[in-house]
A protein has these predicted regions:
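Conserved cytosolic headpiece of P-type ATPases
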Residues: 1-731, 736-739, 752, 796, ...
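Alpha-helical transmembrane segments of multi-pass integral membrane proteins
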Residues: 79, 746-763
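Membrane-helix interface motif
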Residues: 268-272, 759-776, 842-847
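Generic alpha-helical transmembrane segments
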Residues: 709, 790-806
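Membrane-interfacial helical/loop segments at transmembrane boundaries in membrane proteins
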Residues: 275-282, 768-790, 847-854
């Protein structure tokens, strides 16, 4: 339906409606046919499906397979399935954590969506009534006035100075004047921003009043179409998700390969030695299972989830609701932030910033009286420009209500787009005072005098030229400029037409206004630049306005280029790729342009964030690697698709999110390096022992170390504060693997270091337990059960403590441990892990379950000394690395 091409009468006829609206019976029938006037939300996964999705990680699957094998063996041997219970517990806890965090975020977003208005004023059977907005149907006649939010897409039937702010849909910050006149038919479909006789769901009436007939509701509205596209769009994996998935696959393949290799080696050796028995094969298989348990960092998934959750909690305290855990990390590697202007970088509130002419009190008295904006409680209501004028007068001590009591309005000529002026008449002790405000070039043509030193003097051509020059200078600064003039009468004039009143005026002055930038946004953009992040402004506003605001913010250089939507439409993808490489400001853009810009950055390999509050931002927010919505002024559609919602609509929160994202990713890498070097040490320890023909650790020992000893320090590393240079370095390359920057090498040699001290501890235990002196070769083949248990106990305790002490090394990959501040969480984790590891050795029931023996003071001291050795060795290597990189 091209309702904007038809007359108001035809639109009503096509909708089978009338100027007095529908009857209640008609409305009920249409509601049953069309459904409620609400946007459909994307159906989320069920709780069970969410839980199962948490188990799809390859490492989790290998763990579940190991648990299944262990369960079968426990049944065969009639043993208590301790290994199985531990594995299943950690898998379940990790899955529950993920589901709980997602559910909390969804509830936060649902709460934000309750901020929308719920009722509308309509005509039903010719009578005005208030109905729930969700019950509106096509054909309903809606009554609109200043302060209302448009409840559905409507065709204007009557406009009395009706102006609507549509920035949520079009990105245009200035209110648009609406009329009932049909638009000419040139055969081309018009975009919403060009339809002056249509109003759209989600827009706000800022001035005047009118009537409109509903032409579309719910998902059939412009907002609904965008919501549908977003609900059906897929979700891209974040950089962290991709890296962890890749790491899981690599570890899983390595585990399977190592297990198969060890199993084949042992079976082959048994066959060569004289035969393979079932018990021998079973024993070999258990060694392979031990390796699987050792190689997989069971706590990794839970640690990553919890570290991300900690980041989410910290962000929520700083007014950011994270909808997806991994969004925190994605912000940390963001290279480009594409931001809408209105309401995001600016305050979405017109403010007077310049005045010229008569004294401010005299000028703003005229502007305030010649305005329809007014104070309602503690806020101003009305068209944004007039609100700015009335507020500026109030700031000068000139409250409009007091002015109107002193100079009551006795006549007016409302603003219209043809005259570009508004005139009001006010009674004064001397008679009647007229105030006129409007476009400077138009008002100035009606002026014959100017007010100087308390009296009217003729307006010379030279003075007129100087006033117009000042107008141009103000316009060049992206100010919206209005001119004020006056005229005095001894009594109320009988002829009150525009032609009679708006001539022979006396010029008072110019007032310049703009939607000011957020002060914190300037600092935030400077911080982004320091962090190597490129800020880009994408707006529906005029080119000159966008350029001026961008320069104030520091986004655009003095000679920088601004690209318009019209220019962008003429470009193919290759030309656009070149343009986004050099342009940081895009003006007069449509929603599809925003998506193309984001896609162009993607083709260049840039991790891109998109911030915004309007429906027009939503498709690009969906397309970006991370979408940032505004909680206070943002539309429901935008909040639904955003990865993160700023509850204070403060752009500066983005910088905090970037910093938090970088800190979280750094800490996740520290935790991963710690866990992998620890698990590598376990694998190498078992591998060496297997090759030499003895057993050093059982699967239950490894599970205890991985889940009890290692998890607490890994979590404490996730609480580490950001390093000093965190916001002075460039974003990391999203293509970098999890082991980038030499981390893979560090994992390898640190794993070897812990392996060495663990094996030394085992053989030290044998030596301490043997009643006679033995050489090292004999120790490998020792058969004394007590000596073996002592060696195994010392190996377990040394491995546990070495990993705990090694966690202190992981606080920074390059900085010395002794140059850093304190991490109380890590000290707490060390004490807790030390206590738990010691308890296992000395509580008889636990020691028996783990097949341990209590260690003597000497054995305990040797184990601690060997474990502590990892700190000076790593410190020495760090010192060498710092010297090399210096």
């Amino acid at each position: 339906m091209q309702a904007y091409r038809w007359t108001a009468e035809r639109v009503l006829r096509e909708l089978n409606s009338a100027p007095g609206g529908l009857s209640h019976k008609q409305a009920a029938a249409r509601l049953a046919k069309h459904g409620e006037n609400r946007l459909a939300r994307k159906k989320g996964d069920s709780l069970w499906r969410r839980f199962m999705l948490q188990l799809s990680d390859p490492m989790i699957l290998v763990l579940l397979a190991a648990a299944a094998v262990s369960a079968v063996l426990c049944v065969v041997h009639r043993e208590f399935p301790a290994d199985v219970l531990i594995i299943m517990t950690v898998v379940t806890v990790n899955a529950v954590l993920g589901v709980v965090q997602e559910s909390k975020a969804e509830k936060a977003i649902a709460a934000l969506q309750e901020m929308t208005p719920a009722t509308s004023r309509v005509l039903r059977g010719g009578a005005e009534c208030t109905v729930p907005s969700r019950t509106l149907v096509p054909g309903d006649v809606v009554l609109l006035s200043a302060g209302d939010r448009i409840p559905a897409d409507c065709r204007v039937l009557e406009s009395i100075g009706l102006r609507v702010e549509e920035s949520a849909l079009t990105g245009e910050s200035q209110p648009v004047e609406k009329s009932a006149a049909p638009l000419p038919d040139d055969g081309q479909a018009l975009p919403p921003s060009a339809c002056s006789n249509l109003v759209f769901m989600g827009a706000n009436v800022v001035y005047g009043r009118g009537r409109a007939v509903v032409i579309a509701t719910g998902m059939d509205t412009q907002m609904g179409r965008i919501a549908h596209a977003l609900n059906t769009a897929g979700q891209n994996a974040t950089p962290l998700q991709k890296k962890l998935t890749q790491l899981s696959k690599i570890l899983s393949l390595l585990v399977l390969a190592i297990c198969a290799g060890i199993f084949a080696l042992d079976v082959g050796r048994s066959l060569l030695a004289g035969g393979l028995t079932f018990s021998g094969a079973l024993s070999t298989f258990m060694v392979a299972v031990s390796l699987a348990v050792a190689a997989i960092p069971e706590g990794l998934a839970a640690v990553v989830t919890i570290v991300l959750s900690i980041g989410v909690t910290k962000m929520s305290r700083r007014h950011a609701v994270i909808r997806r855990l991994t969004a925190v990390e994605t912000l940390g590697c963001t290279q480009v932030i594409c931001s809408d202007k209105t309401g995001t970088l600016t305050q979405n509130k017109m403010t007077v910033t310049a005045r010229t002419g008569v004294p401010p009190e005299q000028l703003m008295t005229a502007m305030a009286l010649c305005s329809d904006a007014h104070r309602a409680g503690d806020r101003m209501e009305g068209e944004p420009t007039e609100v700015a004028l009335v507020q500026d007068a109030a700031d000068l001590g000139l409250e409009k209500a007091a002015l109107e009591r002193q100079y009551p309005r006795v006549g007016e000529l409302p603003f219209d787009s043809a005259r570009k002026m508004m005139t009001t008449l006010h009674r004064t002790p001397e008679g009647v005072m007229q105030y006129t405000k409007g476009a400077p070039d138009v008002v100035l043509k009606r002026c014959t005098h100017t007010w100087q030193q308390g009296r009217a003097v003729p307006l010379t051509e030279d003075l007129r030229r100087r006033i117009l020059d000042e107008n141009r200078r103000m316009a060049d600064r992206a100010l919206r400029v209005l001119c004020a003039a006056t005229r005095q009468y001894p009594s109320l004039p009988s002829a009150r037409s525009p032609e009679a009143l708006e001539q022979g005026l006396c010029y008072l002055g110019l007032v310049g206004m703009m939607d000011p930038v957020r002060p914190e946004a300037v600092e935030a953009i400077a911080a982004c630049r320091q962090a190597g992040i490129r800020p880009v402004m994408i707006t529906g506003d005029h080119r000159d306005t966008a350029a001026a605001i961008a320069r104030q913010l520091g986004i655009l250089e003095p000679e920088g280029e601004v690209l318009t939507g019209a220019q962008l439409s003429q470009m193919d993808d290759r030309a656009l790729d070149d343009a986004v490489a050099r342009c940081s400001v895009f003006a007069r853009v449509q929603p599809n342009h925003k998506v193309r810009i984001v896609e162009a950055f993607h083709r260049q390999g840039a991790v891109t964030a998109m911030t915004g509050d309007g429906v027009n931002d939503a498709p690009a927010i969906q397309a970006a690697d991370i979408g940032v919505g505004m909680g206070m002024t943002g539309t429901d559609v935008t909040k639904n698709v955003a990865d993160m919602v700023l509850t204070d609509d403060n752009f500066a929160t983005i910088v905090a999110a970037v910093e938090e994202g970088r800190r979280v990713y750094d800490n996740i890498r520290k935790s991963i390096q710690f866990l992998l070097s620890s698990n590598l040490a376990e694998v190498l320890t078992i591998l060496v022992a297997t090759l030499l023909g003895f057993t050093i650790l059982e699967p239950v020992h490894l599970l205890w170390i991985n889940l009890i000893t290692d998890c607490f320090p890994a979590l404490a590393l996730g609480m580490e504060q950001g390093e000093p240079e965190i916001m002075r370095r460039r974003p990391r390359d999203p293509k970098d693997g999890i082991f980038a920057g030499g981390m893979g090498f560090d994992v390898a040699w640190q794993g070897l270091l812990v392996t060495a001290v663990t094996l030394l501890a085992y053989f030290s235990g044998l030596l301490l337990a043997c009643p006679v002196q033995m050489d090292w070769a004999a120790l490998v083949h020792i058969t004394d059960p007590l000596a073996h248990k002592t060696g195994m106990t010392m190996a377990f305790f040394t491995l546990s403590m070495a990993e705990i002490y090694h966690s202190f090394n992981m606080r920074s990959r390059r900085a010395s441990l002794f140059s850093m501040g304190q991490n109380g969480y890590l000290w707490g984790a060390m004490v807790l892990s030390l206590v738990l590891s010691t308890v296992v050795l000395y509580v008889p029931a636990l020691a028996a379950a783990f097949d341990f023996v209590p260690l003597s003071g000497t054995a305990y001291g040797v184990s601690m000394a060997l474990a502590l050795a990892v700190i000076p060795v790593v410190e020495l290597v760090k010192a060498v690395q710092r010297a090399v990189h210096r």
